[in-house]
Amino acid sequence: ALKDINYVIANIPDHALAYYNRGIIYENLGQPTQAIQDYSHAINLQPDLLEAYHYRGIVRYGMKDLDGALADYNKAISLGLKSSAVYFNRGVIFHQKGQLSDAIESYSRSIEIDPSNARAYYNRAISKLIVDNYKEALQDLEISKRLGYSKAAEIISQYY
C-alpha cells in the first residue's frame, strides 16, 4: 500500500488524500513524525480535510504533545467535524490538563453524537467524581455499565 501511495504522490504531488492516506499508513507503521508531516501536507493542500486534523491530533497526543493535539481537535471541530471520537479525545486532554468542566462538556458532546459510547459516559463520570458531582457520576457509570463497559461496574462496586 505504501508503494502505491508513493507512486500517486510522485505523479500527482498535490493530491491531498494521498498524503492523508500515507499519514495513516505511517501512523500504523509506528512512524509518527512522518505521519504528522503527511497530515500537515494534506492540510496545507486541502485545509477543509477535517479528518486530517483529527488524525494528526491523535498522533500528537501519542507523542505527548497535548497542546498540539488539542489545537488539532479544536480546529477540526471549528471547521464542522461532527465526530464522537474527536470530542472524546478532546475530553481526555482537558481531563489530563485539569480542565474538568471542559472535559465534561466535551464528553457530553461525544455522547450527543454517539449515545452508545460507553467510554464517554465512564470518562465523564470520572470527571464528575473529581468535582464532587456524585449523583450524576453514578448515573453516567450506570449507563456505561449497561452499555457493557466493565470498568464502570468496577467503580460502582468499589465506591457505591
List where the protein language model places each region:
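Alpha-helical tetratricopeptide repeat
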Residues: 1-160
